[in-house]
Each structure stands twice: as C-alpha cells, then as structure tokens.
Amino acid sequence: MGMAAFGKNYLKDKMDKIILIDDDMFKLNLKYFSFYKNNSNNKFFSKKFVQLFGEPKKANQKFSQYHFDLAFSFQRKFEEIISKIVSKAVKKTKIKKLTLSGGCGLNGLLNANLIYNKIVDDIFIPPWTQDSGGCIGSAISYLTKKNLKIIRS
C-alpha cells in the first residue's frame, strides 16, 4: 500500500492476465504461479510470470520505479476485487456497514475507496487488526444466528 502511492498505472492489462475476476469472485491464473506445485525448487512464480513481469527483486537490490508501478497495479487490483466482493454482499444483505480485520482492514486505500464509491456507508476496523479478528467475527456471527446474547464488557 505504501509503495503504491509512488507508482504509475500502466500494468492493468498484465494484472488482468494473472488475477481473474469471475462472478464477483477472483481466482489466480495458475499458469503464472508455481507455489501450488509439489516441486523442489520452491519458486513462487512460474517462468510465464517472470516473462510477463520480469525477474523478482533480489534482497540486496534497490527498489526501482518499476517496483512502485507493480505495487500500484497490485493495489488497484486488490481494491477492484474486494470492492466487487463487498458490493455483492451488500446487494445480498442490504447492509451497508462493514467490519474488516486482518491485513485487509489496515489497507487505508481500500477503505477510502469503499466509502468514496458509496459501496458502504460505514467501516469498522477492530483494534485487533491481525487475522485472529476473523475468529471473533465468526463467534459473533454464530451467537447472532443462534439468537444468543452477546455479553459486552
């Protein structure tokens, strides 16, 4: 998210090749990834990915403008995906209040996009922003569905 602010938007077509949006959900085009294969080289990206985006940055290599441009494009794709998922949920539930936790909840650009584009009216980011916040949300959902009392302290 931080690097994205310094990037330029010209890699959208490449992002559209590797991250597909279908029926308001997303999936990775696995032709571009190799992390799911049981292989010994432990490479995350396939040769096809490297041909499309170039060699991964080495640990001792400085960031180039291209890295900032990649961050910008990934950020925009992330916003597009989450916005579509949230829009679908709002349409189904008619609830325009959203709670986000985990790394997604800390993405200020995403949150601003959801409010600015009127996808939701309000976003709550719990103080426990790590992924364990999802466990708390699941517990609250269960209690609500079972009409059990939620005790607030």
For the regions a protein language model found, what residue spans apply to each?
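Short acidic/glycine-rich loops and adjacent helix/strand connectors
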Residues: M1-S153
